[in-house]
Amino acid sequence: MALPKGRLGDRMYDLLARIGYGCTEDYNATRKLVVENPAAGIRYFLVKPSDVAIYVEHGAADVGIVGKDILTEASADVYELLDTGLGRCRMCVAAPADYKDDPSRPVRVATKFVNIAKSYYASIGRDIDIIKLNGSIELAPILGLSDVIVDIVETGTTLRENGLRVVTEFMPCLLYTSPSPRDMRRSR
């Protein structure tokens, strides 16, 4: 099973451990990227969240836990099997409090979710210029690099603390388990 490194992967592992699928070594104390419990027949691969779907799609992992945002952005050939009920967030367009859209020019959008942003703005017929960033997305409109951002939002605290507001929410982002189509065909 491919688990995303970080808070959501840790929460999912804790849940799995509580139902008997923990590891023989201390998951939280190791820096190993593969941890297992041979007696339970489970092995966890700890990978970057954006790589979970790739490991599953190519058969290196039978199943993975990944956020809807990552799954959508990656466009991987995997099935969305189950909403785990964890990691409830939403994909949003956010902007400075005083932002006013000017339809006479393309919107400058900063995001790490390029495919999701393009798809959303295409669906509303709006021209955009994408600025690909890998972190601290909220900084872009503050420094005038972009008009708006497209990012995942859980509570909105980071937006508010940086003088930004949600303009629109357009996609829920939940944590999913995702088997590859190849695995689904094998299990039939």
PLM feature spans:
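Bilobed "Venus flytrap"/periplasmic-binding protein-like clamshell domains
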Residues: 2-35, 90-141, 145
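Translation machinery proteins
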Residues: 23-42, 46, 57, 73-82
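N-terminal organellar transit peptides
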Residues: 25-34, 150, 165, 169-171, ...
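Ligand-binding pocket segment of bilobal, Venus flytrap-like solute-binding proteins
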Residues: 31-36, 140, 147-160, 164
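Periplasmic-binding protein-like
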Residues: 85-93, 158-159, 163-178
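Single conserved hydrophobic/aromatic residue that forms the stacking wall/gate
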Residues: 176-188
